[in-house]
Amino acid sequence: MVLHQRLKSEWSYIILEVVGGTTPIDEIDDISLRHLITLALNQSFGIFGSAIPIDFLHRQSKFLYLRCHKEDKKKVLVALGSYVREPEQIRLMVLHASDFPCQAVPFS
């Protein structure tokens, strides 16, 4: 029996930093952050963009570790990099994006 390992991942991993805002970042819950990401995708790519599946892998204070499908990576990066939530002045800054989870190293 030959074991086969896939070296090409189907997923992309993204590290975001939540920046700015009048509300302290630690007080924003995960559902609100997910809503911000959906709004960013909707603003850039409409209703079809908001349907792009994104998984929250981990949250460490103001850093978010996300996973999306490799084919959607460019759309997700464009949408997140250009979105600013107006009343609160919250924006999502992309720090790192990779196709391998080992390259998405947590910040200390």
From Swiss-Prot:
Keywords: Hydrolase, Nucleus, tRNA processing. InterPro entries: Pop8, Pop8-like_dom, Rnp2-like_sf. It holds the Pfam family Pop8. One of its GO terms (cellular component) is nucleolar ribonuclease P complex. Its EC number is 3.1.26.5. Its main location: nucleus. SUPFAM superfamilies: Rnp2-like (SSF160350). It catalyses: Endonucleolytic cleavage of RNA, removing 5'-extranucleotides from tRNA precursor. It comes from the Eukaryota. GO terms for molecular function: ribonuclease P activity. GO terms for biological process: endonucleolytic cleavage in ITS1 to separate SSU-rRNA from 5.8S rRNA and LSU-rRNA from tricistronic rRNA transcript (SSU-rRNA, 5.8S rRNA, LSU-rRNA); intronic box C/D snoRNA processing; nuclear-transcribed mRNA catabolic process, RNase MRP-dependent; tRNA processing. It is found in: Nucleus. Part of ribonuclease P, a protein complex that generates mature tRNA molecules by cleaving their 5'-ends. This is Probable ribonucleases P protein subunit pop8. It comes from Schizosaccharomyces pombe (strain 972 / ATCC 24843) (Fission yeast).
